[in-house]
A protein has these predicted regions:
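PLP-dependent amino-acid enzyme catalytic core
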Residues: 1-211
């Protein structure tokens, strides 16, 4: 479904769907960086929710709910993420006083992380907006998820990391063909990513960008 706008999760300021990729410009100007979220028209959202909730689970992934995700069908990038199982944990529940405790097994996702969900939606959005390269700043699961989805989409991926980058994560990202660049500090990662966004038109997938 096409959102009507993006809105700051802190101050409520709204902006256009093409950005901002650096979060809310109002909060940023006040020295308090804040993310933004998509906003739908209620007249379209409520019927879409009814359609999704009333039909059988036709797709065994998160795109079963595509009508209420901010990406058009022809832009979807997926590796089958989502629809992970719930497992009953009665003994653990009894110990902590929760009689009907269930655990969501997100390790069943393509890169063994719940972050595959965000990465799939973000890379799909990059495709829909016509961006040619995705970029992030991660040394962990988020970077691996973005790398996998970018590879699936056939899009180059640049990931800024630190010098203390774990070998296991480096290997996982490298398998997907990601360009890995180590920065001296965490802050340097974000500065370099910002340069790629501003100067080269890269699409950022990072906790400091649009959510």
């Amino acid at each position: 479904m096409r959102p009507r706008a993006i809105r700051c999760i802190r101050c409520g300021a709204e902006g256009d769907l093409g950005g901002p990729f650096k979060g809310c410009p109002v909060c940023r100007a006040n020295g308090k960086p804040s993310n933004v979220q998509v906003v739908y028209d209620d007249a379209e959202l409520l019927p879409a929710l009814r359609r999704v909730s009333s039909r059988p689970l036709e797709l065994r992934n998160m795109w079963h709910y595509r009508e209420v995700l901010p990406v058009s069908d022809d832009a979807i990038v997926t590796l089958g993420e989502g629809a992970t199982p719930l497992l009953a944990a009665p003994r653990m529940g009894a110990k902590i006083g929760i009689p009907n405790l269930y655990l969501k097994v997100e390790s069943r996702n393509p890169t063994s992380s719940f972050k595959d969900r965000l990465a799939a939606a973000a890379v799909s959005a990059a495709r829909e907006l016509g961006r040619k390269v995705v970029v992030g700043s991660s040394s962990g699961n988020a970077g691996a998820a973005v790398a996998a989805m970018a590879a699936r989409a056939g899009m180059p991926c640049v990931m800024f990391t630190t010098q203390q980058f774990p070998l296991a994560m480096k290997t996982q990202m490298a398998i997907y063909g990601t360009y890995l660049l180590a920065a001296p500090t965490v802050q340097d990662r974000w500065s370099l990513m910002e340069t790629g966004v501003d100067k080269l038109g890269w699409f950022p997938v990072d906790r400091k960008s649009v959510v």
